[in-house]
Amino acid sequence: ALVAGLDLLPVTPSGHPLKDLTKAPVFAAMIPMQVYNSLQVPEEKAILQQIRHLIIGGGPIDSQLNAALKDFPHAVWSTYGMTETLSHIALRRLNGPEASDWYTPFESIQIRLSKENTLVIYAPEICEKELVTNDIAEINGQNQFRILGRKDNTINTGGVKVQIEQVEAALKEHLSVPFLITSAPDEKFGEIIVLLAEGQLPDDIEQT
């Protein structure tokens, strides 16, 4: 803000950071929960839509939240970063013609995959050594990446590695009750995939 000559608008940290604002800032950084909360209040939603540059970080963006942001008139970005990188090191556009599933690293950032297909980051301006993450990723020909899940969320069932996040994403549109995917020991397959649901499953979901 100081480098760009911007005016800072201090707000009290909360789940509704826009509630006391009367005009939209040019730039804002929020977490997914704050964006979701703001969308539920008409006055806050109106301000949210007027933000010229909105970056969202600190956690994954749900597909429904992503869909709610696609028609925003100004630029909305998802950021990728962690404590070790001090700030975000890549951006992914969520709306407009440049919307993408892939993160584009900043020019000074180099990326590669480890032998376990986890993302490895080299940010020489921040750290001398490479940072090996637990995020299982895919890198395309344009040196962009997307996150498939966490290494510690992989189930090896019968020699087939299944990423929990991908299974949950596939099931989410079919299940209206809260649920999660986990695993259980199995004599034949070593591990089997288990669905834990809160409440009654729909009748058309086969239970075995």
State the predicted function of each range.
Residues 1-37:
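AMP-binding/adenylate-forming
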Residues 90-94, 114, 198:
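Short beta-strand-to-turn element immediately C-terminal to the catalytic PLP-Schiff-base lysine
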Residues 25-27, 52, 135:
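Conserved acidic residues
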Residues 77-84, 103-104, 182-185:
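Beta-strand->loop->alpha-helix junctions that form or flank phosphate-binding loops
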Residues 27-29, 55, 196:
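Structural motif
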Residues 41-97:
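Gly/Ser/Thr-rich phosphate-binding loop
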Residues 134-208:
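AMP-binding/adenylate-forming catalytic core of the ANL superfamily
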Residues 110-132, 136-138, 144, 194:
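AMP-binding/adenylate-forming core of the ANL superfamily
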